From Swiss-Prot:
Main function: Condenses 4-methyl-5-(beta-hydroxyethyl)thiazole monophosphate (THZ-P) and 2-methyl-4-amino-5-hydroxymethyl pyrimidine pyrophosphate (HMP-PP) to form thiamine monophosphate (TMP).
GO terms (BP aspect): thiamine biosynthetic process; thiamine diphosphate biosynthetic process
GO cellular component: cytoplasm
Region feature (Disordered): 63-85
Organism placement in taxonomy: Bacteria, Bacillati, Cyanobacteriota, Cyanophyceae, Synechococcales
Pfam families per the UniProt record, alphabetical: ThiD2, TMP-TENI
Gene: thiE
Gene3D superfamilies according to UniProt: Aldolase class I
Cofactor note (record): Binds 1 Mg(2+) ion per subunit.
Stretches for region Unknown: 1-125
Region spans: Thiamine-phosphate synthase: 126-349
Designated name of the protein: Thiamine-phosphate synthase
Annotated 2-[(2R,5Z)-2-carboxy-4-methylthiazol-5(2H)-ylidene]ethyl phosphate binding sites: 304
Cofactor: Mg(2+)
Length: 349
């Protein structure tokens, strides 16, 4: 009774307000983890934290509530209106909850020790969960963008590589796979950084071929691996869940295996004979059609693909291709990019 009567009503009001703030913010993040990420593990933690705070939301705090006399009620900051993506909403609400929990921890220390201790424990737990949630959100965003990609430009060494990529991006290409096979690591890093900046400026995905270290160094959207590169589980452990992982395939068995693994997309080919991989026999367009029937993951046909032979792939339902020479070797990379994109976006008859 002494604690009840000695509680400063102003402290009771701010504890009530911050309990509301923390629980509401946790619910905002929880719903994104539930509906946006479909991460049961995160939802369970967030729901548990909400309920633990709810049990500590005593009647004496609620009785002190006075929204009418609260000078901060209804106040907005311009930053609150500048949230245009789920990631920004999650970041803002995690920050909101962390601040509220710190207030509860500090003001509750002398009037409600259990609340203070619980607020501290949840705050530290949220620091880690926020990182996990934002990483998963980045991966979710990248995977959504991947679904919209129809044309992937694979680079090949040439004096005007950056200019050609820039032209392709301006023409609507939304995915670039950088093959960094020549030069020193310092030169490769510099080139990858330039391409990463270009892709960010144009809202395009940048995938680094083979080199996980370079992909991480330039904060690329993902990495593409061949059949003889690191196993998928090892690669995923290195790049984390927030980046894309592609795998080259050359047969239906390899497609089926990649489908079962934690890959985000597949490259399948060579569809036609190609100077890049002359030792590999062409698999033909028909096999691409068969592959599309056994996986829901995006499949990019690759290998000697050009405007001249694109119809054969489209006839079997293929709407995603990866090209090298068709753009990198074209006299007019802008027109080549636009023509390929126009053909790939034609409605199915």
């Amino acid at each position: 009774m002494g604690c009840e009567s000695s509680l400063d009503p102003r402290v009771a009001r701010l504890i009530d307000a911050n309990l509301d703030r923390a629980r509401e913010g946790l619910r905002v993040v929880e719903d994104w983890c539930r509906f946006g990420l479909e991460r049961d593990d995160l939802v369970i933690s967030l729901k548990d934290w909400r309920q633990r705070l709810g049990k500590l939301h005593q009647e004496r705090y609620k009785r002190a509530r006075s929204t009418v006399t609260d000078p901060g009620a209804g106040m907005e900051h311009p930053a609150q209106l500048d949230r245009h993506s789920p990631r920004q909403v999650v970041e803002a609400n995690c920050g909101r909850v962390q601040e509220a929990l710190r207030v509860l921890e500090e003001y509750g220390r002398n009037v409600d020790a259990p609340l203070s201790a619980e607020a501290a424990a949840i705050r530290y737990g949220l620091y880690d969960l926020e990182v996990t949630c934002l990483t998963a959100t980045s991966g979710n965003n990248r995977r959504n963008r991947l679904q919209d990609c129809q044309l992937c430009l694979i680079t090949s060494p040439c004096p005007d590589l950056v200019d050609r990529v820039k032209t392709a991006l301006r023409s609507g290409v939304a995915m670039v796979q950088h093959r960094c096979k020549s030069g020193s690591d310092l030169e490769r890093l510099a080139e990858a950084r330039t391409l990463a900046a270009l892709c960010r400026d144009h809202g395009a995905l940048l995938i680094i071929n083979d080199r996980i270290d370079l992909a991480l160094a330039v904060d690329a959207d993902g990495v593409h691996l061949g059949q003889d590169d690191l196993p998928t589980d090892v690669a995923r452990g290195l790049i984390g869940p927030g980046r894309l992982l592609g795998r080259s395939t050359h047969s239906l068995n390899q497609v089926a295996e990649a489908h079962r693994e934690d890959c985000d997309y597949l490259g399948l080919g060579p569809v036609n004979n190609t100077a890049v991989k002359p030792e590999r026999p062409a698999i033909g367009a028909a096999l691409v059609g068969e592959a599309l029937a056994i996986t829901h993951k995006p499949v990019f046909a690759i290998g000697g693909i050009s405007q001249a032979n694109l119809d054969a792939l489209m006839a079997v339902g293929c709407r995603r291709v990866a090209v090298i020479g068709a753009i990198m070797g074209s006299d007019n990379p802008e027109k080549a990019s636009q023509n390929l994109l126009s053909s790939l976006s034609r409605p199915t008859l």
